[in-house]
């Protein structure tokens, strides 16, 4: 495994593989790698000869300075994990390398519509930061394939639209969320939880499954469902952030034509902001069927 911090160095190294006709798969990360990230790496290996991973905590996508400062940075441990996975190339730039003139003078990439609804409405500029860094990394790495976790459902939709709109010749692969044994979606931010908070955190996934069961059982009073779900989170000591029930294809409000919904959830617990999502087929099930499916794993980093 070779590690590069400079753009010219990693670009030059990867051009050698391109000239040899070897296929490149790319996994962009912000480090503090866990099994979810490693699942992306393994999926990338299925699609390509060369696997490239980037580790970069992108300041442009953070809307709170404390969140950026608290984000775990574990580079040495990350490199050890990537070595064990047989990754070929790791790109570890600094903010000064990626944004040499600072964020204020950086050209940005903005995806209209999808970037300003749902999470984008409450975190202005977040998705612009995501698409700008992903676009820049794509230009540096020039991958044939890129793998992203489905846990960040809206982010994946935004990236797919950017790739389509800009006619990028890159195949985007969505990889299902990896979960802990108790259902909690794996996340770099889980490391911020205290022992007590970690024990309460799975309530987010359980509440999400309850919402899914309610929808499959035929309920369409979405505002009431969300209110009840928020009460469940508060009762467990979580602070609800956002819950949306939307059309999984468009991320717009559900209509009679919607065939699949998506539940998008976030909540604060201690220093961590937890997120999760699950898709739900809009076919009304019997009460027994809905209850039997209530424990199924959710779709979603």
From Swiss-Prot:
TM region(s), chain numbering: none
Reaction catalysis annotation: (R)-pantoate + beta-alanine + ATP = (R)-pantothenate + AMP + diphosphate + H(+)
Alphabetized UniProt keyword annotations: ATP-binding, Cytoplasm, Ligase, Nucleotide-binding, Pantothenate biosynthesis
Entry's localization field: Cytoplasm
Molecular function via GO: ATP binding; pantoate-beta-alanine ligase activity
Matching InterPro entries: Cyt_trans-like, Pantoate_ligase, Pantoate_ligase_C, Rossmann-like_a/b/a_fold
HAMAP family in the record: PanC (MF_00158)
Family: Belongs to the pantothenate synthetase family.
Summary of subunit composition and partner proteins: Homodimer.
Protein's UniProt name: Pantothenate synthetase
Gene source species: Vibrio parahaemolyticus serotype O3:K6 (strain RIMD 2210633)
